[in-house]
Amino acid sequence: MEIDIIGLISACSYALDCIEAELVNIKNKHGKRVAYISVRMGQYFDLPEDALQDLAICALLHDNALTQYISEELQKHSAKDLTADLVANTTNLHCIYGERNLAKIPFKTDVTNAILYHHEHADGTGPFHKKWDEVPLSARIIHLADVVDIIGHSGAFETQRWDMVKQYLIRHTDKLFDAACVDAFFHIFSDNEFAAFRDDSFETKLWEIVPREKQTFGWETCKNIADFFAQIVDYKSSFTSRHSIGVAEKAAAFAAYNGYDPTQVQKMYLAGALHDIGKMAIDNDILEKPDKLTDELPAKKMETTCWNTVY
């Protein structure tokens, strides 16, 4: 089966951005900006083409376990406490979950610990207490790109934002960030290029560096990818654990029973696994409201619109 893996993961990053925007007020296209900054830095370090593609995938999915983390931790803490915990980066759980989830994604190179250690500090004060020379370059790059985007794009695009980013990186060199990554960032980006994020032209440049093209994968790999996305969607709400996988399995079973050929059966499974991905853009207050949704109907209709956007 042919899949544009980069395009599919890019679409998933949009859905993840919706969750982060709801929870910690991060701007739209956060995942893509982190990916763009990361691959530009990867080019500076002369990473080969396959490694750049894998770096882009890891950057797009660096917070892939956010819904799982939220679902499990909300059972222990209030939403207010959880938001503060995420902003402070005082937990390593979403890194552990995220690293484990990536086992379902078909990488071309070794990306071990790219997600697990993407919140580590250069001086060893991060969640796992690993110093910069114990952390893969990919994780160090994503860490810097993630923080830069959060600081630089948490408000309007202004010159003072660039100054804020510069001062933050300089002040935390050899503390939060290793000097090599900081130097790479400053060699690549200027205030003018940083301001270009305003018009989203960076996205075109991202796909020029990491081309979107269809690749052929076996059914097991395609199923793993679909299950990966379904898991992210189902953790969005406490009412939908394994819901998408259940729909996928039943849709495939019905298709087989009605005489569909094997390829059509597989496509029905994929459709079932992804049928609720639009819910990622809907607030949990609406999804879990134990009452009629008359007032929320316009927002609920957006689920279909968001599904089409992701699709």
Residue positions per predicted region:
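Metal-dependent catalytic cores of enzymes that make or break cyclic nucleotides
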Residues: E2-Y311
